[in-house]
């Protein structure tokens, strides 16, 4: 059976070259005589894997030495609690709510202190990003939290908050590695890997070292960033397979794509094809303010919900799967992460036009 074009928001497509390499190494990795899924995390082979994965991430993202990297189980949702447990030293933090996940992060933080929602785009169903330069931030906030790309509603920040003395914490789950990021603008960057990096089962956090070591004594051991980072993510058994796959994807980005600047050009070209088509007809509609349209997650609707269902069903039959929009939005969503080839976008647009002509 031929591979489909998978537009899932996550878990999502992985580069075919990476999958083939993982397939080739599945039974026997290097000279270990065993699979990565079987080997001890204390073995010399896995030690080399995790060390090289971190080193490659530092190169690809240009992460300075005074930032620490941790590989965590629990996904980005667990980070919603870890962030306030580790960083809310003043008892309060500022949250900008631009969608479902930033809202969930704020609700989780409110269990541990004062989570001030200083701005929200809920008034227009999260179809824009508030002006980060016009927000009344709290000077005594421990940090400012954002979700930099909103998977469900299809928006992205065009600039990020910068408040002197208040670190910025960003959930980058659905846009990480899609373009270069100035890491020094952030106190902490975290992301689940299942959207743009690797199979589900892990989150990665990149943390400025001056923010570490401030968690209260009663914070559970495995919810303390310092626990894992001081042990090089090996305090307990790490998600070995995810780390291995992350390493393969990073090397693919570095060696085959040529880095994140090239990846950004490819991604923006892919998104332009789809958005240009959406803007050139009146059967489908994208509700997002143009300036804030996500490069990774493109949302659209047809004339009515029944037509949306018909579209998704016929698209799946044609080899375009997981286009159904999130239940909070409806319609359709094409998640076009790094691994989605340009031909997948071109063929999707061709299908959309044929469907439009048949149903207009």
Describe every region a protein language model picked out.
Residues 2-4, 317, 326, 330-360:
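PLP-dependent enzyme catalytic core of the Aspartate aminotransferase-like
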Residues 3-54:
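A glycine-/small-polar-enriched, mobile loop at the entrance of the PLP active site in fold-type I
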Residues 10, 109, 120-176:
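Active-site phosphate-binding strand-loop segment of PLP-dependent enzymes
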Residues 32-79, 86, 100, 108:
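Conserved N-terminal alpha-helix of the aminotransferase class I/II PLP-enzyme fold
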Residues 77-144:
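PLP-dependent aminotransferase-like
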Residues 188, 193-275, 289, 358-360:
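Active-site C-terminal subdomain of aminotransferase-like
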Residues 284-314:
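Conserved PLP-binding catalytic core of the aspartate aminotransferase-like
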């Amino acid at each position: 059976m031929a591979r489909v074009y998978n537009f899932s928001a996550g878990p999502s497509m992985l580069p075919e070259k990476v999958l083939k390499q993982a397939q080739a190494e599945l039974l026997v990795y290097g000279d270990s005589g065993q699979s990565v899924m079987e080997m001890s995390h204390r073995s010399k082979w896995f030690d080399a894997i995790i060390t090289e994965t971190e080193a490659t991430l530092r190169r690809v993202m240009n992460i300075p030495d005074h930032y620490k990297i941790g590989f965590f189980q629990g996904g980005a949702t667990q980070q919603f609690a870890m962030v306030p447990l580790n960083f809310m030293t003043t008892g309060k933090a500022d949250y900008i709510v631009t969608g479902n996940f930033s809202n969930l992060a704020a609700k989780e933080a409110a269990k541990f202190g004062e989570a001030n929602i200083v701005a929200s785009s809920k008034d227009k169903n999260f179809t824009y990003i508030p002006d980060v330069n016009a927000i009344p931030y709290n000077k005594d906030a421990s940090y400012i939290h954002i979700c930099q790309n909103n998977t469900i509603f299809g928006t992205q920040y065009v600039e990020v908050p910068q408040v002197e003395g208040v670190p910025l914490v960003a959930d980058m789950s659905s846009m990480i590695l899609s373009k270069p990021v100035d890491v020094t603008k952030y106190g902490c960057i975290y992301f689940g890997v299942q959207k743009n990096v690797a199979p589900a089962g892990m989150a990665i956090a990149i943390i400025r070292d001056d923010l570490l070591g401030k968690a209260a004594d009663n914070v559970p051991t495995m919810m303390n960033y310092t626990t894992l980072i001081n042990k090089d993510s090996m305090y307990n058994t790490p998600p070995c397979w995810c780390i291995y796959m992350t390493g393969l994807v990073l090397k693919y980005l570095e060696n085959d794509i040529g880095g994140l600047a090239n990846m950004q050009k490819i991604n923006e070209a892919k998104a332009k094809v789809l958005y240009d088509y959406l803007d050139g007809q009146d059967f489908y509609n994208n509700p997002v303010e143009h300036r804030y349209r996500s490069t990774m997650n493109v949302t659209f609707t047809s004339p009515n919900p029944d037509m949306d269902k018909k579209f998704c069903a016929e698209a799946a039959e044609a080899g375009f799967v997981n286009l159904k929009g999130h239940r909070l939005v409806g319609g359709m969503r094409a998640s076009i992460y790094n691994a989605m080839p340009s031909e997948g976008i071109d063929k999707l647009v061709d299908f959309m036009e044929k469907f439009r002509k048949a149903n207009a």
